[in-house]
Amino acid sequence: MIRDITLGQFYPGNSWVHRLDARVKIMVTLLYIVSIFVVKDFIGFALEALGLAVVIAISRVPLKFILRGLKPIFILIAFTFVINMFMIKGEVLVSFWIFSISREGLRMAIFMAIRLILLIIGSSLLTLTTKPVSLTDGMEALLSPFKRFGLPAHDLAMMMTIALRFIPTLLEETDKIMKAQMARGADFESGNILRRAKALIPILVPLFISAFRIAQDLAMAMEARCYGSNGKKTRMNGMKICSRDIVACLIFAAFLAMIILERILL
C-alpha cells in the first residue's frame, strides 16, 4: 500500500499535457479543485469526472497507475462516508438502534466521497505530468507578485516542491525498513488495526534517522551548488506561454463556465 501513493511522483512522457506550461497546470488544478466544491448534484460531478477523464486520456498516464493512488486513502474515504451518512439529519431511510441513515446524509456521504476521489486524482495528475524543476519555477512565477510584500517566493516554491518530492522518497524508505524488519521476523500484516499500528512503532526511529540523512545530503548538495547566494538566479530553460497553453486555458474556461451554468440553472 505504501508504494501505491502517486502524489509527488513524476510519470515521464511527451504528451500534450506534459508539454503545457507549469504555471497553466498549477492554476488549472487549483481552479479545478475549487470547482469540485461548487457542484451540488450528480450532473455536476459527472461533468467533473468527464473532464478529468479526458485529461487523463490526453496525458497518456496509465489509468491503473492513477487509480492505484486511491488505495492508501481508502480508509479516509470510508471514514468520511460513514460520518456524513450517520451525522447529517433529514428524511430517515433506515433506522437501527441509536443510528439512522437519512436521505440527505446518504447524498452528502456520496458527494464527499466523490469529491475526495476527484481531488486526489486531480492533484496527483499535476505532479505526474510536471517535472519537479518546472513545478518549482511555476510556483515561483505565480508567487513572484508577492515579493513586493517581502514574501520569499523562490524559497517558498522550493520548500513546497521539496515537500512534494519527499513524499515518495520517504515512502520508499519506509518500505525498505519494513522489508528489512520483516526479514528479521517482524509481522505487520496480522492482527487487528491497533496491533498493526503498534507494530509500526519500531519503524519510526530508523525512518526519522533516514529522513534526517536525506535532508542533510540534500542540504549539502544545494550548498555545493551555491544555493542561497545573493546573485541573480537564472534558469536553464525559460518559461514561455505558447499557443497550446492558450488553447488549454480557453478549453478550461469553457469547462468552468459549463460547471457554473449547471450550478446556477439546475
List the model feature ranges, each with a label.
Residues 14, 37, 60-65, 96, ...:
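Membrane-helix interfacial "entry" motifs
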Residues 25, 64-74, 248:
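Alpha-helical transmembrane segments and their helix-start/interface "positive-inside/aromatic belt" motifs
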Residues 41, 45, 60-64, 88-96, ...:
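Transmembrane helix-loop junctions in multipass membrane proteins, especially transporters and channels
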Residues 51-61, 76-79:
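Alpha-helical transmembrane segments and their membrane-interface exit regions
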Residues 73-186:
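Juxtamembrane/interface alpha-helical elements of multi-pass membrane proteins
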